[in-house]
Structure formats: C-alpha cells, structure tokens
From Swiss-Prot:
Sites of Pyrrolidone carboxylic acid modification: 35
Quaternary structure annotation from Swiss-Prot or TrEMBL: Heterodimer of sulditoxin subunits A and B; probably disulfide-linked.
Taxonomy, superkingdom: Eukaryota
InterPro entries in the cross-refs: Snake_3FTx, Snake_toxin-like_sf, Snake_toxin_con_site, Toxin_cobra-type
Cross-referenced CDD domains: TFP_snake_toxin (cd00206)
Family: Belongs to the three-finger toxin family. Ancestral subfamily. Boigatoxin sub-subfamily.
Protein's name according to its UniProt entry: Sulditoxin subunit A
Organism: Spilotes sulphureus
Keywords linked to the UniProt accession: Acetylcholine receptor inhibiting toxin, Disulfide bond, Neurotoxin, Postsynaptic neurotoxin, Pyrrolidone carboxylic acid, Secreted, Signal, Toxin
Length: 111
C-alpha cells in the first residue's frame, strides 16, 4: 500500500513538472528584465451577449492570442451594441452591418 502511494506521488510530481514546462502552470517572470518568459497570452473578456449578457470577468486566452476584440451589431434602437467579446491571434474581420474594435492590452475590451 505504501509503495502504491509513493508511486502515485511520484507520478503527480512528474506530471506537474511537465505541465509547468509546457506553460500550463503559472506564468514565469524574468525578474531582471521584468518580462514574461514563455509563450505570450492575452487576458480578455470572452463572452456572447446571447448566452451571458453579464461579462464581468476576464479570462486567459490561448497561447499567442494577444488581441482582444469586441464585435458590435445593430440593435433595435437604430444604434449598436456589443454582441461578442473575445481574443484572437489577429483582429477579426467584420461582416455586413457589423463593427469590430480591437485592442492589445490586458482587459482592454471591457466596454
């Protein structure tokens, strides 16, 4: 029983170590240069007005998705309102009667 627990502990430690090497753990910071080490990621608000109208928490984006965007669509009052907020590698293209606003700083699509 003790050997089984010891083997399980070793497997957990090895898996956690490999997760950190893959960048799945905490973001590492180079203290001297004050920069993040490893693949860049964005921190954007990600939601759809139809499924979650309250978009109050920013989420970590996938690797290299550093562009935050807000997609606006026409509303009933002849104006426009946001329809989708998210992150992408590059700024998405707006469709007909749509407008996309892109930004490149963490949590910048909170409007």
């Amino acid at each position: 029983m003790k050997t089984l627990l010891l083997a399980l502990a070793v497997v957990v430690l090895v898996c956690l170590g490999s997760a950190n090497q893959l960048g799945l753990g905490r973001q590492q910071i180079d203290r001297r240069q004050r920069q993040a080490i490893g693949p860049p990621y964005g921190l954007c608000f990600q939601c759809d007005r139809k499924t979650s109208p309250d978009c109050s928490t920013a989420k970590k984006c996938p690797w290299y998705h550093t562009t935050c965007y807000t997609l606006y669509k026409p509303d009933d009052a002849c104006g426009e309102e946001w329809a989708v907020k998210g992150c992408a590698k590059t700024c998405p293209t707006a469709g007909p009667y749509e407008r996309v606003k892109c930004c490149y700083k963490p949590e910048c699509n909170n409007d």
